[in-house]
Amino acid sequence: VGEVDPAGGFWSLDLSFRLKNVRNRPLIFGSPATEGRPAAGYGGLFWRGPRSFGGGEILAAEGLEGPEVMGQTSPWLAYVGLHDGTGRGSTVLFLDSPTNVRFPCKWFVRNDPYACASCSFMFDEEYALEPGEELALDYRA
């Protein structure tokens, strides 16, 4: 847990992933989009929201918003959704680290038919991790 603020009503979670290629050939990362399926560039960090978040609001840097954020680069993405039966909402904020490969990432994001967001360094272009190299990915949500 990165930070907890009960008075402010928020908390954050820091996520770090490390993968070392121990093979004697490159390890290739791709997505369905790199195989020819349009707007299917999910991979890397992936979040699927609760059913009640369907139809939520999508926001990103530079004034980007809505489903048009799909495939766009941004150092952050916010998803605002409502909770069943309460009338209350929450905002989930995803931050891509400047130390990550291909920062800022391209986002795979939907609000219909369900809420999801993916910070994808291989959205529409394969990434090769060479033998002996380590891939380090850091995020905050």
Description of each model-found segment:
Residues 26-100:
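Active-site/ligand-binding surface loops and adjacent short beta/alpha elements
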Residues 1-34:
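Acidic, contiguous internal or C-terminal segments within carbohydrate-active enzymes
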Residues 7-11, 39, 131-135:
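Solvent-exposed loop and beta-edge segments used for protein-protein assembly and interaction
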Residues 13-15, 45, 137-139:
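Hydrophobic residues positioned within well-ordered beta-strands of beta-sheet architectures
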Residues 15-16, 48, 60-63, 103-112:
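A generic short-segment signal for beta-strand/edge and adjacent turn/coil regions
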Residues 90-141:
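Beta-strand-rich recognition/accessory modules
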Residues 18-22, 50, 140:
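Solvent-exposed residues in well-ordered beta-strands and their adjoining turns
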